[in-house]
């Protein structure tokens, strides 16, 4: 609870205690205790789907996902910033995976002046020949997406080597209202958002036929 987590963090210097206000702290703890954060190897008999959060001036995050029955396996992740689309296309082609589709966020269809009036979607499909690229429409609010991701968590298996992703999910948290002495119903916007957004998009994909 709030009191014990705060005590462990401040007085016992515990890094295992849930971050105060964490959206996914309980779900991460359950995944660890149930052995779902482990060595999740690539299965060459299954296709890989990628789910993206694209940052234009900051981080881009890619999740590499395999789905079998009710298991949603995050086998790999990639993040970087300040890179062009050719870089990310190279990351995709450089992996040993067979892909089913690449899911981009809704803003990837926006046309930009810097790209001569072309969208990220158009550049990926025409310049870099990525196949089966789809756009995830923005159907839910951020908080609805976070709730959907929490529901998805019981099906998640996450490769333990994806430390940045796991750390981001653990630190993704609500804003604190110092006047009212309570957490606001919206997240802190920092480096954790890009990883959390990619998970949120994955939770929307899970509801669709895959």
Residue ranges and their predicted role:
Residues 3, 9-12, 16, 67, ...:
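Residue-level marker of positions within ordered structural domains that often coincide
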Residues 41-79:
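Acidic, glycine-rich loop-and-beta core segments that form the ion-binding/anion-interacting portion
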Residues 63-190, 207-210:
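Mg2+-dependent endonuclease catalytic cores in nucleic-acid-processing enzymes, primarily RNase H-like
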């Amino acid at each position: 609870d709030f009191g014990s987590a705060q005590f462990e963090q401040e007085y016992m210097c515990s890094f295992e205690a849930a971050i105060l206000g964490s959206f996914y702290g309980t779900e991460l703890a359950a995944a660890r205790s149930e052995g779902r954060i482990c060595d999740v190897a690539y299965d060459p008999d299954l296709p890989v789907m990628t789910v993206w959060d694209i940052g234009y001036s900051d981080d881009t995050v890619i999740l590499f996902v395999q789905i079998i029955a009710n298991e949603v396996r995050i086998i790999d992740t990639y993040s970087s910033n300040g890179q062009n689309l050719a870089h990310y296309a190279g990351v995709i082609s450089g992996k040993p995976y067979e892909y089913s589709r690449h899911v981009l966020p809704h803003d990837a269809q926006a046309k930009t002046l810097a790209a001569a009036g072309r969208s990220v979607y158009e550049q990926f499909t025409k310049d870099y020949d990525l196949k089966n690229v789809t756009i995830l429409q923005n159907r839910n609010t951020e908080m609805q997406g976070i709730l959907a991701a929490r529901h998805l968590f019981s099906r998640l298996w996450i490769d333990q080597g994806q430390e940045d992703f796991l750390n981001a999910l653990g630190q993704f948290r609500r804003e604190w209202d110092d006047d009212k002495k309570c957490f606001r119903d919206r997240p802190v916007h920092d480096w954790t958002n890009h990883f959390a957004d990619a998970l949120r998009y994955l939770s929307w994909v899970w509801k669709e036929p895959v």
